[in-house]
Regions:
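Catalytic or ion-coupling anion/metal-binding cores of large enzyme and transporter domains
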Residues: 1-76, 80, 89-108, 119-121, ...
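Acidic/charged coordination and interface sites in well-structured regions
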Residues: 86
C-alpha cells in the first residue's frame, strides 16, 4: 500500500470516528430480524400491496420473501435516463426468479445540465441533488422493503440517490447504470464549431447540426463529464456490478447485467446468504477508492463536492486536503475528452474499468480489502462481464491497456499526479482540473476583469475587451448566491482567447463540471463572494496569480488596501424568482460551502 494512501485513509478514519460510530449505531437500530413489512399494521400492509398482482400479494402476505424497492429517475427527455423506461419489468422478472418481489417505490427528478446550460434552470441544478435525496427517502420511508435498486446515471442524480441510500443504510443496495450512447461527432470537432460560432464564423443552424450529431441517441453523453465520472466512481466504490458502467443501453449484455443486479440484491438481504447493507459496505476505505478513481481519470470537478456530501451521509468526513494529498501520488492513467480526444467508448474498448483497477492495485493506490456488491475484495473489479452461450458470466479483463493513448500503465502514466489540483491563497480555496490544461497554461499572473454574471462575458469578448492577458473573474455564482450554476458558456470565448495566444485564466465561485476544458480555471472558490469571501473585493485591474502547479490562488493587492475596501454585493433578485427558483430560497440559504459539499442536508 502506498504510504500516502495509508496515511490519508487512516486520517479519515480517525477524523470520522465519532460520526461514523453514530451512523453505524443508527443503521443497526433500523435493522430487523424479519422482513421489514412485518412491522406494519394490517391496514398499512394492505395499502402497500393493493395494486400488486395476485402472486406478489401472496408473497408479500407470507412474510417470507424479500420485497425490493426500485427507485427510478426515468424520464424520456434525458438521453441517459430514457433507457430506464423498461427496467422495472426486467427487474421484476429477475426478482421473481429469485423468489422475491419488486415495487417501484418512487421516482426522483432528473434534470439535464446539457439542456439547462446558460439558462435560468441551471440555478436549480445543484439544488436538485438535495431534492433527489429527499424524494428517494420518501419512497423508501414506507418500510415495505428489504433492499433497494437505484436507477440513475447523470450529474446530480447518482450523488443524490447515494445520499438517500445511505440514509437507509440498513438496506442492501445496488446501483444500475444505463450505459453510454454510441460515439457521434468527435468531441474535438464539436468544440471547434462552438468556437467558430463564438467568433461569428458559423451560424446557429451549423452549431445545432454539430450538437445534434454529438448527442444523438439514448445513453449517456460520451465525453468524460459528471455523468460518466459518476459511473466510474461508483464502480470503483463497489456499488454496482463489475464492468457494468459502460455497456451500451441496447446491448444484450446490458439487460443481463440489469437482471443480475436484481438477483444480487436479494442475496445481500438479511435472509439471503451474502448479507451486506450499504451503510456497512460504504466505509472510509471505499470513499478513498472513489477519490482515487476521480483523480486517476481526471474526472469531473463536481465530485470534489459530491463525494464530500456522499461520505457525510455515511458519517465519514473528508475535505479537500484529502483530495490534494492523494492527487500528489495518484497518477493520471486515462485520457478522455476533455483531457484528450478519446470518449468513454474508446475507454471501454481500451480495457475499461477492469484494467484501470488492475493498474492502480498494482501501484498500491487502492484499498483492496473492501466489501462490494460483488463480494469482498476490489480485485473482483478486474473481471469483465460477457455472455457465455447467452448466460451472464465474468472473466479476467485485459491484463494491460489495449490502447496506450487512452489508458496508461502505472509505470508510464500520462502524468505523475492526479487530474485535480487544490488551490489555496488569500482568495480562499479552489479546485482546478489540471488534466485538461496544458502545463504551459497552468500558471498565470495577470490583471483581473470582473463580471457578476457569465452572460456579461460574451458581449465583452465580442467587443474586444478581453483581447489581452487577463484573469476573468465571475463571482456571486456560489451556492448561497444563486445555487452555484455551471458556467459552460464561458468556455468557447475563453478558448478562442487562448488560441489567440493570450494568457487567460478563470476564477469563479461557480462550477464548470466535467467539461472543464483547456482554460485554466480556479473554480468552487470558497468562501464564496456572497458569503464573506475576498472575491467580493476584487476590482478590475487587480493582479491575480493562479498557479495550477504549486496550488496557489493569490490576489496581489496590499492587505491594508483590501481591509479598506467594501465588498461588492450586486442585486441578485433576478436569481430569486422565475423557473421555479422562488420555491428553493429556503434550501439555497442553507447550503454549505463548496468544500463542505454544498449541501443543505444535516446528517
Amino acid at each position: 500500500m502506498n504510504s500516502t494512501m495509508l496515511r490519508v485513509t487512516n486520517r479519515i478514519i480517525e477524523r470520522s470516528r465519532d460520526t461514523r460510530a453514530a451512523y453505524l449505531a443508527r443503521i443497526n437500530q433500523a435493522k430487523t430480524d424479519t422482513v421489514h413489512r412485518a412491522q406494519l399494521a394490517c391496514g398499512n400492509l394492505a395499502h402497500g400491496f393493493a395494486a400488486c398482482q395476485a402472486d406478489d400479494k401472496a408473497s408479500l402476505k407470507s412474510m417470507l420473501r424479500n420485497n425490493i424497492a426500485i427507485i427510478t429517475s426515468y424520464n424520456d427527455m434525458l438521453s441517459a435516463h430514457q433507457p430506464y423506461e423498461h427496467y422495472p419489468e426486467i427487474i421484476r422478472k429477475a426478482l421473481h426468479s429469485a423468489n422475491a418481489v419488486g415495487q417501484v417505490a418512487g421516482g426522483v427528478p432528473a434534470m439535464c445540465d446539457g439542456v439547462t446550460q446558460g439558462q435560468d434552470g441551471m440555478e436549480l441544478s445543484l439544488l436538485s441533488r438535495e431534492v433527489i435525496a429527499m424524494s428517494a427517502a420518501i419512497g423508501l420511508s414506507h418500510n415495505m422493503f428489504d433492499g433497494a435498486l437505484y436507477l440513475g446515471v447523470c450529474d446530480k442524480i447518482v450523488p443524490g440517490l447515494t445520499m438517500a441510500a445511505l440514509s437507509f443504510g440498513h438496506l442492501p443496495s445496488v446501483f444500475i447504470p444505463s450505459g453510454p450512447m454510441a460515439s457521434g461527432l468527435p468531441n474535438k470537432e464539436k468544440v471547434r464549431i462552438r468556437q467558430l460560432y463564438a467568433e461569428g464564423k458559423v451560424d446557429r443552424m451549423a452549431l445545432l447540426e454539430s450538437e445534434a450529431a454529438s448527442y444523438h441517441a439514448p445513453g449517456t453523453c460520451t465525453f468524460y463529464g459528471t455523468a460518466n465520472t459518476n459511473q466510474m466512481v461508483v464502480e470503483f466504490m463497489g456499488m454496482q456490478l463489475p464492468g457494468s458502467s459502460f455497456v451500451h443501453p441496447d446491448a444484450p449484455l446490458r439487460e443481463a447485467l440489469t437482471a443480475a443486479a436484481a438477483r444480487k440484491v436479494t442475496r445481500m438481504t438479511g435472509n439471503g446468504n451474502e448479507w451486506m447493507p450499504l451503510g456497512k459496505m460504504f466505509d472510509e476505505k471505499v470513499v478513498v477508492n472513489g477519490i482515487v478513481a476521480l483523480l486517476a481519470t481526471g474526472g469531473s470537478t463536481n465530485h470534489t463536492m459530491h463525494l464530500v456530501a456522499m461520505a457525510r451521509a455515511a458519517g465519514i468526513i473528508i475535505n479537500w486536503d484529502d483530495f490534494s494529498d492523494l492527487s500528489d501520488v495518484v497518477p493520471l492513467l486515462a485520457r478522455l475528452y476533455p483531457n484528450g480526444p478519446a470518449d468513454i467508448n474508446h475507454f471501454q474498448a481500451a480495457g475499461g474499468v477492469p484494467v484501470l483497477v488492475r493498474e492502480l492495485l498494482k501501484g498500491g493506490l487502492l484499498n483492496e480489502d473492501v466489501h462490494t456488491v460483488a463480494g469482498f475484495g476490489l480485485s473482483r473489479y478486474t473481471l469483465e462481464p460477457w455472455l457465455n452461450n447467452g448466460e451472464l458470466d465474468w472473466r479476467e479483463g485485459a491484463t494491460a491497456p489495449l490502447d496506450d493513448q487512452v489508458i496508461a500503465t502505472f509505470e508510464k502514466p500520462f502524468s505523475r499526479h492526479g487530474g485535480t489540483k487544490v488551490l489555496s491563497g488569500n482568495l480562499g480555496r479552489a479546485v482546478m482540473k489540471t488534466s485538461a490544461v496544458p502545463v504551459e497554461n497552468q500558471v498565470i499572473e495577470a490583471p483581473a476583469v470582473v463580471f457578476e454574471s457569465q452572460h456579461d462575458v460574451l458581449p465583452a469578448f465580442e467587443a474586444g475587451l478581453l483581447d489581452k492577458d487577463c484573469v476573468v473573474v465571475v463571482r456571486h455564482q456560489g451556492p448561497k448566491a444563486n445555487g452555484m450554476p455551471e458556467l459552460h458558456k464561458l468556455m468557447p470565448p475563453l478558448g478562442v482567447l487562448l488560441d489567440r495566444r493570450f494568457k487567460i485564466a478563470l476564477v469563479t465561485d461557480g462550477r464548470l463540471s466535467g467539461a472543464s476544458g483547456k482554460v485554466p480555471s480556479a473554480i468552487h472558490v470558497t468562501p464564496e463572494a456572497y458569503d464573506g469571501g475576498l472575491l467580493a473585493k476584487v476590482r478590475d485591474g487587480d493582479l491575480i496569480r493562479v498557479n495550477g502547479q504549486t496550488g496557489e490562488l493569490t490576489l496581489l493587492v496590499d492587505e491594508a488596501e483590501l481591509a479598506a475596501r467594501q465588498p461588492h454585493i450586486p442585486d441578485l433578485s433576478a436569481s430569486r424568482v422565475g423557473t421555479g427558483r422562488e420555491m428553493f430560497g429556503a434550501l439555497r440559504e442553507k447550503l454549505s460551502g463548496a468544500e463542505q459539499g454544498a449541501t443543505c442536508i444535516t446528517f
